[in-house]
């Protein structure tokens, strides 16, 4: 089985078109793309409500509502004129085999990065970030992590495949440096001695966006950054369609402003995870995820215009 393939390989969970109706390219390694979008339809590491495997399809589906705006407000330029972005479809793996998914995703990412591409990935549950971090660390070395979430995902339970343990495992493997990493929007219990800077939801909601961004920049410094956004960072009023919703989160407006504020960081990889459309209302969670993903691409495109 190939790592990537035609859409019929994952016909139960895949689309026939790309994010923002961007070109589909099932062999992106030799393409001239700057950024490659990969869907990872996986939710076997979920502890709460399952259904994240349908997240990539939902994000792509609702992104058609964003494709019409060329000079996007407030950027006032067309990202597609500055970045060559392709969608390579979904990772193909034997459903039910978490280890195969992890190994194939890491291999796919390593091949893309070796070819000079950058990755924007759609989960799937948050475990998919760990094989992506492994691939990125091989290419870029130890990185800083900027992590939006309701949970720190630093829990040590001894389980190999768990969407709540990646950021316990990643520092131990030398993939990320907790002392230069920040977790934003947290509002569940966590270990305060793991080295990460935690900006909990109360702090982030009560402080100005500029103040939060200034602290993030100070923590990260000039390190290569991996940006991961768990959609449950948003309050369930804005993102009900997720496996482990927690009230008291960020508004979609504040989240977008925070992502825009990361423009000056050296971001080398990005993902949006944990969209579970079965629990969504009027596709608002998928729309939030698609919009945040688009903003992530815009902060990359903005650098090319400077």
From Swiss-Prot:
<dbReference type="InterPro" id="IPR005925">
    <property type="entry name" value="Agmatinase-rel"/>
</dbReference>
<feature type="binding site">
    <location>
        <position position="230"/>
    </location>
    <ligand>
        <name>Mn(2+)</name>
    </ligand>
</feature>
<keyword id="KW-0661">Putrescine biosynthesis</keyword>
<keyword id="KW-0479">Metal-binding</keyword>
<dbReference type="InterPro" id="IPR020855">
    <property type="entry name" value="Ureohydrolase_Mn_BS"/>
</dbReference>
<feature type="binding site">
    <location>
        <position position="151"/>
    </location>
    <ligand>
        <name>Mn(2+)</name>
    </ligand>
</feature>
<comment type="function">
    <text>Catalyzes the formation of putrescine from agmatine.</text>
</comment>
<dbReference type="InterPro" id="IPR006035">
    <property type="entry name" value="Ureohydrolase"/>
</dbReference>
<protein>
    <recommendedName>
        <fullName>Agmatinase</fullName>
        <ecNumber>3.5.3.11</ecNumber>
    </recommendedName>
</protein>
<feature type="binding site">
    <location>
        <position position="126"/>
    </location>
    <ligand>
        <name>Mn(2+)</name>
    </ligand>
</feature>
<dbReference type="GO" id="GO:0008783">
    <property type="term" value="F:agmatinase activity"/>
</dbReference>
<feature type="binding site">
    <location>
        <position position="232"/>
    </location>
    <ligand>
        <name>Mn(2+)</name>
    </ligand>
</feature>
<dbReference type="Pfam" id="PF00491">
    <property type="entry name" value="Arginase"/>
</dbReference>
<comment type="pathway">
    <text>Amine and polyamine biosynthesis; putrescine biosynthesis via agmatine pathway; putrescine from agmatine: step 1/1.</text>
</comment>
<feature type="binding site">
    <location>
        <position position="153"/>
    </location>
    <ligand>
        <name>Mn(2+)</name>
    </ligand>
</feature>
<keyword id="KW-0745">Spermidine biosynthesis</keyword>
<dbReference type="GO" id="GO:0008295">
    <property type="term" value="P:spermidine biosynthetic process"/>
</dbReference>
<dbReference type="GO" id="GO:0033389">
    <property type="term" value="P:putrescine biosynthetic process from arginine, via agmatine"/>
</dbReference>
<keyword id="KW-0464">Manganese</keyword>
<keyword id="KW-0620">Polyamine biosynthesis</keyword>
<dbReference type="InterPro" id="IPR023694">
    <property type="entry name" value="Agmatinase"/>
</dbReference>
<comment type="similarity">
    <text>Belongs to the arginase family. Agmatinase subfamily.</text>
</comment>
<dbReference type="InterPro" id="IPR023696">
    <property type="entry name" value="Ureohydrolase_dom_sf"/>
</dbReference>
<dbReference type="GO" id="GO:0030145">
    <property type="term" value="F:manganese ion binding"/>
</dbReference>
<keyword id="KW-0378">Hydrolase</keyword>
<feature type="binding site">
    <location>
        <position position="149"/>
    </location>
    <ligand>
        <name>Mn(2+)</name>
    </ligand>
</feature>
